[in-house]
Amino acid sequence: KKIDSLIEISHGLWEGKLEAEIREEWPRLLKNWHEKPEEVIMPEGESIKDVSERSIEAFTKICSTQKDNDLTLLVAHDAVNKTLICNLLGISYSNIWMIKQGNGGITVIDLFNDPSKTPVISALNITTHLGGVIDSTADGAL
């Protein structure tokens, strides 16, 4: 089932451009994106806060519907995954670049039926199934 709240961040006018192209037109904003991502709204796009609000709401709803021994596959994109992971770890979105989420990477989050138990991240960004130990599928991308 497709959940629109889990789509990738809207890069707005940056959509489809390589980082080098963005640097040519928006050097200061790109610098801020790297240094203070939680403060940037991409031109005609979204902010990390926008993504986090919609993705956390969707994740919480998914979690609330789980039953004993349910196995759920959630497929999402880089910014969505990173905001969910930041939220689970209780870290600021200013630290979002500390988390790698490669294209096709697998992250496993164990949920518990007891709502007082915090979900556990048991695997993060597994990419070996893509043919290499180090993921380079997004080289040059934002």
Where are these regions (language model features)?
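Domain-level recognition of soluble alpha/beta enzyme cores
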Residues: 92-116
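Active-site catalytic microenvironments for nucleophilic, acid-base chemistry
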Residues: 61, 65, 87-91, 112
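Short glycine/proline- and acidic residue-enriched helix-loop micro-motifs
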Residues: 29-50
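Amphipathic, non-transmembrane alpha-helical scaffold segments
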Residues: 23, 48, 52-56
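Phosphate-coordination/substrate-recognition cap region in phosphate-metabolizing enzymes
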Residues: 1-30
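Generic beta-sheet signal
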Residues: 68-79
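Conserved histidine-centered catalytic loops in small-molecule metabolism enzymes
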Residues: 1-5, 110-142
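GST superfamily/GST-like fold recognition
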Residues: 78-82, 105
